[in-house]
Structures are given as C-alpha cells and as structure tokens.
C-alpha cells in the first residue's frame, strides 16, 4: 500500500497582528493549521507579539514567529515578507492588516497626519503586496487579503485621510486581482464596520448606543467575526473569489 504524503503546511503573514483584529486573524489561521508570522511595528509592541507567537505554537502545534517591521518602509516590508517565507519555506497567505488613524476635520488636519495614515495603510499594503507577489507568482498559488473599511467605501466626516487610504486599498485590490488571477493568486478586501478593539474602547456609552442603533444586528462586531471571514478567503474553498470587497458591518448604513 502506498504511503500517503502529508501535505506541506501553509505559511501565513499577518501584518499588525499583535492585538485587535490582526491578533484574532493570526489565531484563526493557526487554528486552521497554518504556520503564522506575527508582525508589529515597534519594539514596544514586540513582547505582545512574541507572547502571541508562543501561544500559537503551544496551542496549535504550528510554527510561529514574531517580527518587528514598519510596513510603510519598502525595505522593512520586503525583509518582513522574505523572513516569513524563509521561516516557513513558503508563503501562501498575506493579510495586510496594519493600520493607523489620525482623525480630524480636513480644515484642521496637519499634513503629517494625512501622510502618516497614507504611508501605513495604503503604501504599507502596496509594499507588502509587491514583496509577496513575486513569491506567490513563482509558487503559482496564494491568497492576499487586504483590510479596507466601510469608511473606505462610503467616507466619513473627520476621517478624510483614513477614508482615502482605505479607498486606495480597494483600488490596489481590484487592480492586483487582475494581475495575479492567471497565476492562481486571489486578492480580496475586507471592509469592517465598528469592531470591538482598543480603538472602540474609548467610546462613551452614549456613543456606543448611537452606533449600535445604526447597525441591523444591534451590536458592534467582534474581532473573531472579521477573522472568520479572512480565514475563509485564505482557504482553498475561496479559489473562485477575487477582486471583491466584502463588507462585514452587521448591516450598518453610514
């Protein structure tokens, strides 16, 4: 009887994954049996990233490592992607989750606040996609999931920089999906609404009630809600889905 060859374990990189939505995504992909590279942007966040990587390895029996890289830097993004690829021997999934906000009305917004958001959210996505594309094209397989936002779809007062960055992510997603589809690489965007994270912890009870009243499901989303969607888009079952922007907002209307 011929011995069955065990399939090689897939490798995934999730940027901005030391906390919040990114953390939930990293855990979800590890639970699905993937080796996962956890990323944070600074040494200050490294202990949390290392703790998550250790938890992933201990709980799910997969390889995991934590790496510091500012994805706004093309050089650091390239090194990050290459390091994940080297560690796992392959790179099947890239989740561009790293993102920041610097909210303010346009009339009062500082140029550096506009640039900072664009650099991380939009340029960072481009940098990581560019680095991963070469690997995935050579493999003739891969999944790229970019984190957009409902704000990138509909806009929002006081978030012109954030909205522009997330709308740009949609543009990159649709363009890159056309470039990579012939090589069996899918590229999709996820557009979350209000999700329970550190960013929403600062909301007052009154603000929470106002937001919840605009959501058909009557509640803010959980990081795991987003992670479950990303896990599906990263799976073999999602091979015929590409170039899509999927809103996960509980039926919210901005």
What would you call each of these model-derived segments?
Residues 90, 181, 186, 222, ...:
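Short, small/polar-rich loop/turn modules that mediate ligand/substrate recognition or access, typified
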Residues 134, 178-182, 239:
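Alpha-helical segment proximal to the catalytic Tyr-Lys
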Residues 129, 165, 173:
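Active-site helix of classical SDR
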Residues 105-106, 110-118, 200, 211:
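Substrate-binding pocket helix/loop in short-chain dehydrogenase/reductase
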Residues 11, 18-20:
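Conserved glycine-rich cofactor-binding loop
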Residues 149:
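Residue(s) in the substrate-gating loop at a strand-loop-helix junction
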